[in-house]
Amino acid sequence: MDRRAFLTTVAAGWMVDTILPGKAPLAGRIIGASHGVGHLVRDGGAPTPSGPPDRADVVIVGAGIAGLSAAWRLAPAGLDVRVLELEQFLGGTSTWGDDGAAPHPWGAHYLAAPNPEARAALRLLEQMGVVKGWDAAGRPRFDPRVLCHAPQERIFYRGAWHPGLVPQDELDAHDRAEMERFSRFEDELTERVGADGKPVFQIPLAFSSRDPDTLALDRISMRAWLDREGYTSPFLRWYVRYACLDDFGAEPEEVSAWAALHYFAGRKLKTPELDGSHFLVWPEGNGKLVQALSERARATVTHGALVTGLDTIEGGRVEVRWLDVRDRAPRRTHARAVVVAAPAFVTRRLFPSAAARLPTRTSSPWVVANMHVERPIDPDMAWDSVLYDAAGLGYVDARHQLTELSARTVLTYYRAYGGPDVVGARKGLVVAPWEQIANDVLLDLAPAHPELREQITRMDVCVWGHAMPRPRPGFLGEQPFEPLVLLDERVAWAHADQPGMALFEESQASGVRAAEAVAPALGIALGSTWL
């Protein structure tokens, strides 16, 4: 899809202030990633620094989950750790806003209860007080105030809302039979063990089976797998498509069958308290986890810092070149070690000597829209509201977990542009004006909320050009679950692009792993691994 075609598609309806003639124009703005400045790295337009360098023990490039997790892991060592971040916010796609009736997510909005094997995630949750203790079987006990309250989910299907994501009473016999068949398979797959004695799917991914029969699923798409297994139910196909878009930002034909089935069978933790919900939820979404990492990282964060390149130099140092975007002044920092917490395509440009070893990933653009509401739009709200067969993924209610009563809230809408032409979609979104994107959101939600335009006072939108890696067929590579970490003795890489799946546990583990990998070059002992 080229840019002109994209804009024509997005603007296919009316402009926002003409949906309901005579109404005051809807307020709003586009916020988020600094696409134009960031492209200086791609285009080689940044000047070369000439002044004296400053010094640090460790420089971390990027303040997303991976970068902050690396700083968190290094904190006990008492080092001078500098984090260089382009944006004015922390957390990358896990960031949040607090300019409404409640804090609200600008990206990732929940954490599924981690498996016991996700030791780093559980360590952080225990430090936060979310994990309250451990049962006799070594399973974590969670603060019930953080587990998603009921009603958790609802779906708008055939003109009405229904509890949960599967409206059992409304499905025809064929749809119901195939959903039941798939559910049984999902349960069996969750418990299945490979020939090497490991679960076929596990989180963290490194604990998954290397069984060749299971790994063969990575050679086909999820759509091809559905065809092969004879699943023809329209609702089942929609259900799987929704899962692929929600977790990977891609259509089933663009997703490895291994990755898609991992989505359904990778969560193992079962306790009585999780019978109602497996989701850990905060008003600001995973922004709560970003705050927790930042508070514990003991690092100095420089915002508005565009890293343009790095090289190893004499004296056991790494030179990091960066641009202060506030005054466009080129600067450099000499560090004893560097963690590059950036996507593979960025890391490839920053450290060309490692380019050939980095995986090739594609990513989908996303739109996230935060709609500010002064009065309830629906008397039976759930935390997550999904519209069947809509373009977007629905919306979540930021106030769902809050106990104090208030009519005001913020509803966060998500849409992934998951087709094969991510480049065209990305280019179109980056130049699309706010009015067109906001109009698209309202039109998508109109079947369930025809009066939504009257019920919201403001809609801010964020365009994530490279939101998350898409685990396409073959993404596991020739050496599955053995991520590239050290690019050089003193340069480590940490990002969700390593495993190719944007799970919190994987991003966090990549940061912890990178920090532990550069410890020898720093001459420090971090003790036992946190992984």
Predicted regions and their residues:
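Active-site/ligand-binding neighborhood in enzyme catalytic cores
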Residues: 194-309
